[in-house]
Amino acid sequence: MGEEYDSVEDISGALLLHVEGYGDVRLSDVADVEVIDNSADSYTRLNGEKASILKIYKNATSSAGEVSDNCLTAFEQMESRYDGLHMVVLSNQGNYITIVIQSILTSMVVGAALAIIVLAIFLKDVKPTLVVGISIPLSVLFAVVLMYFTGLDLNVMTLAGLSLGIGMLVDNSVVVIENIYRLRSRGVPAARAAVQGTRQVGMSVVASTLTSVCVFLPVVFSASLVRSLMMPMSLCIGYCLMASLIVALTVVPAAASTVLKKAEPKRLVWFEKVQEKYAHSLEWCLQHRALPLIAAVVLLVFSGWQVLNMGVELLPSITSNEAQITLSTADGLTKEESYAIAGQVAEAALNVENVEEVGITTDTSMAGLDISQLGLPTAITDILNSANAYGRYKINVMMSKSLSSREVEKTRQAMEDAVSQIENCTAEVKLYGMTDDLTSQLATGLSVKVYGKDPETLTTVSEKVMEIVNDTEGFANADNGLGSGDATIILKVDRDKVRAYGLTVAQVYQQIAAKLTTTATAQTPVTVNGTTMDVQITDNLDPVTKENMMELTFETTEMSADGTVTNGTCTLNDIASWTTGTAPDAITSENQTEFVTVTADTLKGYNTMVQSRVLQKKLDEYAASGEMPEGCSTTLGGETEGTDYMVNEMVQWMALALPFVYLVMVAQFQSLLSPFIVLFTVPLAFTGGLLGLLVTGQQLTMISLMGFIVLMGTVVNNGIVFVDYANQLRIGGMERRAALVATGKTRMRPILMTTLTTVLAMLQLVFSGDMASQLMSGMAIVIICGLSYATLMTLYIVPVLYDILFKKPPLNVDVGSDDDLDDIPDDAAEFIAAQKSAGTAQPEA
């Protein structure tokens, strides 16, 4: 074997050995060699015509998109080379990735454009807008270079990180250019405004960036699943932020000192009116401090409770124009009858409107494994296939690419209605999404493990659990996997007789197993005239049957009463008996305890986690009622187990990130109290994010939880800038509440600008409706609503907390001097002078 032959006759004439006095013994002398057409062993059709289905897998180091493009090119070349060859792609994961990447790139461009528009509106000047606009491509280029040197590829998760970074990376540049522009409007020369404006907010910008970056540090402590999903995105966001910090502290002031030399800052009359109204509302909040705090806490509790009742899921479902029909024909049908029904189902699906391609093939998987990939001898593979494949089919459906998500669902429902009319079969029609492969590994859907001592008890208890599951609203089609059992030959070994013959049960088992596995050896294929074929060796002289298996001979050792040892033989018939029956094939063992898994489908419109809480109460009642046999127990698994695992990992991530954020702010403020005030904006952001999910009907997922982690680092930025500037004004001699109102009016513009640039950059991911939106919309909604709500609250709650906690006046007063270029222009002195001229100066509280 392993050689190449020109024909079957060459194989038949292969020399086996030479016998003296007889001559050469060739293969044809002891065996018949023939080529058998086994195409009927599987059923494969494309749009009703005979076909072959190929599955192509990429290796671990290759890009799915690149492999997909190369395969499509190769298909076109083969179609042009061979007449009559027609190749149709029924499923292409590389296509999903390409679509998502293109969508995210579009979001990046749109987000950058919207950010520049926001700057133009607030600054009312093209020059500072262009300065910030330059920082966007520079920061992205810097981030991409860092990605290259750290070995990160451009994929869905890294581009999602860049897309998030687009809205965030202009924040630092906006704060710097706005402060420079503000000083320039006071008549400060361009060079001095660039230096002093950058120094005035420099430490705040550094602290803000570090808080945004440090929230991603705990990802290295996460379990492999969370780390593998979130590490690329986290690194990309971190690279963007660090790049934006460097650009904001170097390129932006350098460009501003040149561009703004002849600039004449323009007044924003409409915004000045907004500032005055905000100042009056802030003064009212400072006089009624309890009301805004109570409102913030009530909203946080309400939103959290409502979202948890909505449920949690692992990953958002991403629908595409592909569907898969899992078909099972009734038991007792012949192969031809089963094939005919499968053809009817495929034809019914093809006749549905908007369906373009339908491919069907026999399903050779068993218990989640592909039998053909197990490396078993061909004869055993054929036996398993014959018991498994005839009657089980997978049908891949390709719908029109122009369909919307709603139209795709309508087409799926139409296919389900069409195939349900066909008798003697059961079919399930599911849409195929990009996250399906991952979620299938995480065991989605309902799963209940039933533990017990023996198969009979497990069967009884699992049937009761199935009844409870089916009675629970939101669940249907409960199954314990036992069914009616497969037809099985049950061999009962008499242990006493085995010991009497000097044997052990293990010896009997090993010899039976050896007999069953030596009937086929087909590990090496042969090549005949350029065609590679598998080899099937069948021993027709000694076939395996129930009868001749019972005549299997064992060597025995018997000892008489006087100690004499006698060697002999016995047959399997002497020590065992056989019967036919059924045996369950789904009872498995865990920690030496047998269990059965009960699974069920979650109906559309219901959440597995929410309904699992109801089911858990019913299972607890069943266990407490005394009906459950002693030694039996139940645990929820599947999506419930996977979601609990994911939520715990993400909560631990948040818990670890919070101290990092606090420590960075302690270093910035050199105070333990100031960071606490800023840290209060984190639950405010959570309130906004939770309310956003509640209003839009989105569920908590791993992706949306990532949005909350991003918020932890970003929402404190505005608080840092606010508190830092308020401290500067109080050190300059201003009264506490006057400093807070002045800070709010002064920092309102950069706070709103940074918020709007981030929010507008995220909007494309929410409203585009494409595959990237389906994947990232949850996180985008959390960031948009959380940041918007937290920004509004920062302008009110942070001043209120500052007013409550900072009772003591500042110890050091530094009014500064305008003679030294390195001295910061004294904003506090200017505000105090304005108050005196208006007659509103107040003593320090």
List where the protein language model places each region.
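Extracytoplasmic/periplasmic membrane-proximal domains and adjacent transmembrane bundles
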Residues: M1-A113, A120, I177, E428, ...
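Transmembrane helices with small-residue packing motifs
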Residues: E3-Y5, H18, Y148-D153, V220-S228, ...
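Hydrophobic transmembrane alpha-helices and their membrane-interface caps
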Residues: A113-R182, F660-R747, L752-S768, C785, ...
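Solvent-exposed, membrane-proximal periplasmic/extracellular interface segments of envelope transport
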Residues: M1-E4, A340-Q441, K497-Q510, A514-T517
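Signature of alpha-helical transmembrane segments and their immediate interfacial
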Residues: V201, R267-P316, V448, P825-Q835, ...
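Extracytoplasmic/periplasmic
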Residues: E313-N396, D417, P455-T488, K836
